[in-house]
Regions:
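Bacterial N-terminal signal peptides that target proteins for export
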Residues: 1-8
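Bacterial N-terminal signal peptides
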Residues: 8-16
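Early extracytoplasmic/lumenal segment of secretory-pathway proteins
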Residues: 20-94
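Extracytoplasmic ligand-binding site segments that recognize negatively charged/polar headgroups
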Residues: 38, 81-82, 88-207
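A ligand-binding cleft/hinge motif common to bilobed small-molecule-binding domains
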Residues: 90-96, 205-231
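Periplasmic-binding protein-like
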Residues: 113-116, 129, 186-192, 226-250
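A bilobed periplasmic-binding-protein/Venus flytrap-type ligand-binding module shared by bacterial periplasmic
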Residues: 132-138, 242-257, 264, 273-277
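Extracellular/periplasmic juxtamembrane helices and adjacent flexible linkers that interface
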Residues: 253-256, 263-307
Length: 307
């Protein structure tokens, strides 16, 4: 009889300890950071495994276009489960320009996020995406500047939407740097349009052989292009760039984790090994007035004025 009592007591004790362990684990199991992105996919959460393990948080990525993010946030209001928005272009910021985002405060200082660039409407620029020129090494068409695409060579792009950012750089240079020479600007843009031809995707095993103008991320993520040994990539001396950016959703349910994510990115902002997962380059340290530099905020302003 005593043995039965001892056994039952042991069972109760084990069950009690097991229940306690479940209760203690519950808060961790429910810690989650939800990121809405127009370029990340659910599988990309693996690149944040270090943060996930350190903070004991599950990172969920919802892939949707910037305009869909805008619609979702407007529809959900403060009931949204999205904590952070992560876009691949200034065009994404433009699309979301009427959406309010949360100022990041509460103990954060500029020093803590020193590798990120704060811009208007509480966005953080976290990486740049240069416009590159790519052609076959044995091609007779070998431009070294963007300007030549407007006058000497036929070109195309697999991502025509991003060319709007490129053209905003051209407009900025002429309006701000070259005395607002409208005639030359129109000639530049007209020539760029006239020299553009239709993009040919290629086949499942053969990449396009055309002269391309595209963002570096688009090139690096296109396996056929990136693995084509005969193709060369040029970074023009006066480099135009688009930018990746993130912003915190107002009253984010997991606000503390969004701050941890920003800190994590800041720690890896200059790691080429980390950034290459996303086709990014580290942000420029060049300041206005020192070397060739066009402020992303100036480009964003020009994009906004186009509508």
């Amino acid at each position: 009889m005593d043995r039965i009592k001892d056994f039952l007591l042991l069972v109760v004790l084990v069950a009690s300890l097991f229940a306690c362990s479940i209760d203690e684990a519950q808060p961790l199991a429910h810690k989650k950071l939800v990121i809405a992105s127009d370029f990340l996919y659910p599988k990309d959460a693996k690149f944040f495994a270090e943060l996930s393990e350190k903070e004991k948080v599950a990172i969920e990525i919802i892939h949707m276009r910037a305009d869909s993010i805008q619609y979702r946030l407007k529809k959900d209001g403060f009931n949204t489960n999205i904590d952070l928005v992560f876009v691949q272009s200034l065009l994404g910021i433009k699309t979301l320009e009427n959406q309010a985002f949360q100022p990041v405060q509460n103990g954060f200082s500029d020093g803590e996020l020193s590798e990120l660039k704060r811009i208007r409407n509480n966005w953080f620029l976290v990486g740049k995406d240069p416009f590159v020129i790519s052609y076959l090494k044995d091609s007779l068409d070998k431009p070294s500047t963007y300007r030549e695409l407007s006058s000497d060579y036929l070109w195309t792009s697999p991502d025509l939407a991003s060319v709007d950012v490129f053209k905003a750089h051209v407009r900025y240079q002429f309006q701000k740097k070259q005395g607002n020479n409208q005639k030359e600007l129109k000639d530049w843009l007209r020539g760029l349009k006239d020299h553009r031809i239709a993009y040919q995707e290629g086949t499942d095993s053969t990449a396009s052989t055309q002269l391309l103008l595209l963002k570096y991320s688009a090139y690096s993520k296109n396996k056929l292009l990136a693995q084509m040994k005969k193709r060369k990539v040029i970074f023009p001396k006066q480099l135009y760039c688009d930018y990746f950016a993130m912003a915190v959703v107002p009253q984010a349910k997991n606000y503390a984790m969004t701050k941890s994510f920003l800190l994590f990115w800041n720690e890896n902002a200059n790691s080429s090994k980390f950034l290459q997962h996303f086709g990014m380059n580290a942000l420029d340290r060049i300041k206005k007035g020192k070397g060739f530099y066009i402020s992303p905020e100036e480009i964003l302003a020009l994009l906004s004025k186009r509508n």
